[in-house]
């Protein structure tokens, strides 16, 4: 059956939800001009709705519920369901794994009173460790009505996330899917795994252009900011596109409104705040009870330790992937070995390397890392414009164009040589991998062919690198310079060459080859930039966005996701690799950015603003959305190191990894990723198991292929819980994996049990 995008109408949206969503956007627009950047991440420790009036309201509701016969029935049925769920989650001595069918049922499948589910056997042993169990009232401090409302709303949000993830071939955890799905309904494995091209074998040429599949001759046209595919001219004239899921803006706005309304709902905020506090406390208790058991498990694991487990730098920009000393050394080397080489042309006059430095009145011999001035310092804190200037060595854009760009007189040779030196260092380390970002701006469709040519001509491929394309959100700059007529043209320049290379790879061999090693897209720029526009179904379509105003963040994300979704389905149909959408999100700016990413992104970079929204933070936990965090980068730009939420997120069970962002600006040593791990371990006193868990997360989040992940993490890495962990490869204790899995199942069971309770009450009536 063809995959189609399920559509909704604005008329389906509840008026109360619509008003709440608009209030959130309006509040954000008001706050953008008045907020104090220094208090951006200051979050009160008390409960979000813990004021006196709210507490009194909750108390009155509790007292009213105690007198309600209907509530008494619901509580009784819920306690029975909860006891069954708990019995399934707590392994017995003979228990060998999780139930073969999820203990959770669909709300449309009522539980038969008195029936008990039987856990099936799984082919692995559940580790023995000390578990902490909470019994008694299911939600002290929150009424049954509020609890059921919060649980149903959270479950609906997860279902919305699952819909967008499945359609774009993004990842969604199988455990969460099973708790949301109908009983016995299994989620196909291939649906949950992105399709990355495996690395070439040692005897294969990574630059071979002869394996392109045949051309299809499909036609592509942009409509409303999204590229549509047509089988032939006749189908184009009939407006009958090729059978692929095409996004619908109205549906997206309805779904986003539901999430926006949810994050402002008082009872839901209270419930999520309490659950997050519980998760953090539960991990502290787990550490106290099982730290030595985990350590013994790691000590008995031969050959493997923190140094020789695979780690991936999941967020790094290619233009700053080398440290400042490396850049300085390379500049001096090129000046010493080829000072008379022609490196630029200006007004028809060829310029040598010596003349470039003479025009800047400097001698490379006298340069130091301090005079190079590419490191972020105190003056860049809350100054993104000052940070961007650090990409210019000694403040000279000429040196940036010469050494850190792919398009220049030398065809990006110097930049390629430096990237290859960084790649060789990774290969020598054996256990470190990297996912550098290369820029596509959307000024011209020729950017893609130029970038692919740079990659092949300079032989930049490395088995320890996978590439991500970053799209800077700077349409306003190009429009003001009359380089683009509309935002739609920018989208077309970014995505049309990819569709053409997918449909007719024989005609675009270089780009087809380059795309094998590209695993995702990123959206980058200063998130704190103010936008006066509120994205809605009434927003102008991209081809009509002709003003010099930059579209808001959520506008960028929707149209990037929409085109990636169609492209991924087309490529999957052709048996080609697919792409993940991995935007920068939650570093600064509005909380609505994280709502947009919740719907559209496979994973995000930074995520600091999750600290401000308990509902979103809890949703990111339940959906296990990967977050690549860069505390050293944040320390120089937005948030001092000690206040970074990485440790807190890790303890709660969010899927976090460590990344460097920009080693040239933030790091001092040759191994920037190890520097990141070392500082985190020292500041937060992370254990070996903590570090190895973060490293394992980084491999799972990365664009490494299925075959590589099996080699680095174990044959069953895609399974969740201890069954998916091979301690011989990951050095993560099975006790830790079992704790994470059982805790997630427990949190998910709260949602499913609330929905079952409602069904049983209705059945009894």
Swiss-Prot record:
Cofactor requirements of the protein: Zn(2+)
Cofactor comment: Binds 1 zinc ion per subunit.
Reactions the enzyme catalyzes: AMP + H2O + H(+) = IMP + NH4(+)
Keyword entries, A-Z: Hydrolase, Metal-binding, Nucleotide metabolism, Phosphoprotein, Zinc
Active-site residues, record numbering mapped to chain: 606 (proton acceptor)
One GO term describing the cellular component: cytosol
Binding site for Zn(2+): 315, 317, 584, 661
Tissue specificity statement from the Swiss-Prot or TrEMBL entry: Expressed in adult tissues such as aorta, heart, kidney, lung, muscle and thyroid. Weakly expressed in thyroid and not detected in liver.
Binding residue positions for substrate: 317, 386-391, 587, 662-665
Protein's pathway: Purine metabolism; IMP biosynthesis via salvage pathway; IMP from AMP: step 1/1
InterPro entries noted in UniProt: A/AMP_deam_AS, AMPD, Metal_Hydrolase
Quaternary structure and partners: Homotetramer.
Family to which the UniProt record says this protein belongs: Belongs to the metallo-dependent hydrolases superfamily. Adenosine and AMP deaminases family.
Official protein name in the record: AMP deaminase 3
């Amino acid at each position: 059956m063809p995959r189609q995008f399920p559509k909704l109408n604005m008329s389906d949206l509840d008026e109360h939800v619509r008003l709440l969503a608009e209030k959130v956007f309006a509040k954000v627009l008001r706050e953008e001009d008045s907020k104090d950047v220094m208090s951006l991440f200051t979050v009160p420790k008390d409960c979000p709705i813990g004021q006196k009036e709210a507490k009194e309201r909750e108390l009155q509701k509790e007292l009213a519920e105690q007198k309600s016969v209907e509530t008494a029935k619901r509580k009784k049925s819920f306690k029975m369901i909860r006891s069954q769920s708990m019995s399934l989650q707590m392994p017995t001595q003979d228990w060998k794994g999780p139930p073969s069918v999820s203990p959770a049922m669909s709300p449309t499948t009522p539980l038969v009173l008195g029936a008990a589910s039987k856990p099936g056997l799984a082919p692995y042993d559940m580790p023995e460790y000390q578990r902490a169990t909470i019994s008694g009232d299911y939600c002290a401090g929150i009424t049954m009505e509020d609890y059921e409302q919060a649980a149903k709303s959270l479950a609906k949000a997860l279902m919305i996330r699952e819909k967008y993830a499945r359609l774009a071939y993004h990842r969604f955890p199988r455990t969460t899917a099973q708790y949301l799905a109908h009983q016995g309904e299994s989620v196909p494995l291939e649906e949950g795994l992105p399709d990355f091209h495996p690395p070439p074998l040692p005897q294969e040429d990574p630059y071979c252009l002869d394996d392109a599949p045949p051309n299809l001759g499909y036609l592509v046209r942009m409509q409303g900011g999204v590229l549509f595919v047509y089988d032939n001219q006749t189908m184009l004239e009939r407006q009958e596109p090729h059978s692929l899921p095409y996004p619908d803006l109205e549906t997206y706005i309805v779904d986003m409104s539901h999430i926006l309304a949810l994050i402002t709902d008082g009872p839901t905020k209270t419930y999520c705040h309490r659950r997050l506090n519980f998760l953090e406390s539960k991990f502290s208790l787990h550490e106290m009870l099982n730290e030595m058991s985990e350590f013994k498990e790691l000590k008995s694991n031969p050959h493997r330790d923190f140094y020789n487990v695979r780690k991936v730098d999941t967020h790094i920009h290619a233009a700053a992937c080398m440290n400042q000393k490396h850049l300085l050394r390379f500049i001096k080397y090129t000046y010493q070995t080829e000072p008379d080489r022609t490196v630029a042309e200006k007004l028809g006059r060829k310029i040598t390397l010596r003349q470039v430095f003479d025009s800047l009145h400097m001698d490379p011999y006298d340069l130091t890392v301090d005079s190079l001035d590419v490191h972020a310092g105190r003056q860049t804190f809350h100054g993104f414009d000052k940070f961007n200037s650090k990409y210019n060595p000694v403040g000279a854009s000429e040196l940036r164009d010469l050494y850190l760009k792919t398009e220049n007189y030398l065809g990006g040779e110097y930049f390629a040589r430096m990237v290859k030196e960084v790649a060789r260092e990774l290969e020598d380390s054996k256990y470190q991998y990297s996912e550098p970002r290369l820029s596509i701006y959307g000024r011209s469709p020729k950017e893609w062919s130029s970038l692919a040519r740079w990659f092949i001509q300079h032989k930049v491929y490395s088995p320890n690198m996978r590439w991500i394309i970053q799209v800077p959100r700077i349409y306003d700059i190009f429009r003001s310079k009359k380089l683009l007529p509309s935002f739609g043209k920018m989208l077309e320049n970014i995505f049309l060459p990819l569709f053409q290379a997918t449909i007719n790879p024989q005609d675009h061999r270089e780009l087809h080859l380059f795309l094998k090693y590209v695993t995702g897209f990123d959206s980058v720029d200063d998130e704190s930039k103010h936008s006066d526009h509120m994205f809605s179904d009434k927003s102008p379509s991209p081809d009509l966005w002709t003003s010099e105003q930059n579209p808001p963040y959520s506008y960028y994300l929707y149209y990037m996701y929409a085109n990636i979704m169609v492209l991924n389905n087309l490529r999957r149909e052709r048996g080609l690799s697919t792409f993940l959408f991995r935007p920068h999100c939650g570093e600064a700016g509005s909380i609505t950015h994280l709502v947009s990413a919740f719907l559209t992104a496979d994973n995000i970079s930074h995520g600091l603003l999750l600290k401000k929204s308990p509902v979103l933070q809890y949703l990111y936990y339940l959906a296990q959305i990967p977050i690549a965090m860069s505390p050293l980068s944040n320390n120089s730009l937005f948030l001092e190191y000690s206040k970074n939420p990485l440790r807190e997120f890790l303890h709660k069970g969010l899927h976090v990894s460590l990344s460097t962002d920009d080693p040239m600006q933030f790091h001092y040593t040759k191994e920037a990723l190890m520097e990141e791990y070392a500082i985190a371990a020292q500041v937060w006193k992370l254990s070996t198991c903590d570090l190895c868990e973060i490293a394992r997360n980084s491999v799972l989040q990365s664009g490494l292929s299925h075959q590589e992940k099996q080699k680095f993490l174990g044959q069953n890495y895609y399974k969740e819980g201890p069954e998916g962990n091979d301690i011989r490869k990951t050095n993560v204790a099975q006790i830790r994996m079992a704790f994470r899995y059982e805790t997630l199942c427990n949190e998910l069971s709260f949602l499913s049990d609330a929905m079952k309770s409602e069904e049983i009450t209705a059945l009894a009536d």
